[in-house]
Amino acid sequence: MNERIIIFDTTLRDGEQSPGASLNVYEKLEIARQLAKLKVDVIEAGFPVSSPAQFEAVKRIADESEVIIAGLARAKEIDIKAVYNALRNAKKPRIHTFSSTSDIHILGKFGDSKYGASLEEKRKTILKMSYDSIAYAKTFCNDVEFSAEDAGRTDIGYLCDIIETAIEAGATTVNIPDTTGYTFPSEFGFKIAELKRRVRNIDKVIISVHCHNDLGLAVANSIIAIQNGARQVECTINGIGERAGNASLEEIVMALKVRNDICNYYTDIDITEIYNTSRMVSGFTGIVVQPNKAIVGENAFAHESGIHQDGMLKNKQTYEIMTPESVGVNKTKIILGRHSGRHGLKSRLGELGYHPSEEDMQKVYEAFLELADKKKEVFDDDLRVLMGDEIYKKEELYELQYLHVTAGTDTIPTATIKIRSNEKVIQESCTGDGPVDACFNAIERALEIRPTVESYNVRSVTSGRQALGEAIVRIRNGENSFTGRGTSTDIIEASAKAFLQAINQYLLFTKTNLEFHEDELIIRNV
């Protein structure tokens, strides 16, 4: 008989830790709604204690979601209380706490003698800290998950000890992360099997796994873990995450479905929503899906070889083990124009996973008409970009109101801008080493800020001569990096928008963190 696998999506927590993938509250809400439509079982919405923005995002998602919402916490009371406060209105809250367990992590993070003079003493300290944190979390929430950080490199004997301790303290899910993506499937499968064999009362909890992709083995390790007793997998849309990323949700789900002949497991995922979810996450994070990415890449269902094309024409199953339609790829292009009407636009946005309020819909419709005047034909990818732009505008401090650029072979590039903030309009002109540099210089002069530009990229996000171009700019100011995205049929305008958005992200970060104190998260809403 087939057994159900719980899908724990951590796109909004671990996935957002991808360099440059910062999401605002409204973007996180849209993604959470789409994840619910995808029918994931658990959404890990963030790390509430880390910042006011994280706290607010977790709270907003928890307030409206029907699925299990998890918040991450270190093995500290302040973290756990912050998660509780963020999730207190959730219909199905989960507190997710963790402790370091590998020798290299223990010696690196708990080197101080107050944790013990020897490795063995430090291990005992961590056992007690883990027990206490889980027991404390249980006073707020029945559903508590414990993660043994860097379990992939943790001695199996100590891993069994800490998992047994977690179960005794009341954990309902025990998570075994391959934090550094170090293990081979044979090793990881053995580890899960040993936990099943050696840990008392392991049958009373859910075994979860969280695999990173540093060696390209995250999905393989997740599958082998399932075959050895894991019943929850933690994963992200498009496999995004720190370093080389996490196990890809779409790859795990489709592997279990396509190979159900040898894997007697299933998920509740609505696979027809996979493609829309992938494109939404890519659009909001600015992380492009590689063309040859399994399941959701642009080339995933493309066949160029003559032999392959001939085989496909005769029988699609010759070279396709799943259909593009099964994962939500619409082969029939739906084209909208300025005569499509508000209802037609709203209907198509809903099909793509976007559900703007009536107030927001008016702004979206006006932006759609403006785009339709420029492009004549508006495709799904245009709508995804449009929604990303409109959701971002909810949090901007400064808006680009006007831009005029002169440039040419015998002309000094000059940019004139007008930036609006509330009722105030700032105008500046600057020259530069090219039109983009001139725009950046004018914005810097207007806002009296000069960050370091770490990276600047431009790409086409739709097709044809009138395609929308997207600029992605990453800036650094002090220790923090901020990413801005801008789109337009004019790449110079897109670049200016992206640079201004990155500065807006920095200014919002500075503003909220100046007002932030750890005590606020403990007492808020109590």
Give residue ranges: language-model regions.
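Alpha/beta enzyme core
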Residues: E3-I7, D14-V42, F55-E64, E77-I207, ...
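Mixed-charge, glycine-accented linear interaction segment located at domain edges/termini
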Residues: S481-T483, T487-F516
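Short, ordered loop/turn segments at secondary-structure junctions
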Residues: L12, F47-P48, R74-A75, S99-S100, ...
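Catalytic alpha/beta core domains of metabolic enzymes, predominantly
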Residues: T183, F190-K314
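Non-catalytic terminal/interface segments that mediate subunit docking, oligomerization
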Residues: Q17, E30-I31, K376-F482, G486-E493
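A mid-to-C-terminal "edge-of-domain" accessory segment
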Residues: R4-I5, T11, M254, N260-S429, ...
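Short, highly charged C-terminal tails/helix-capping segments
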Residues: T512-V526
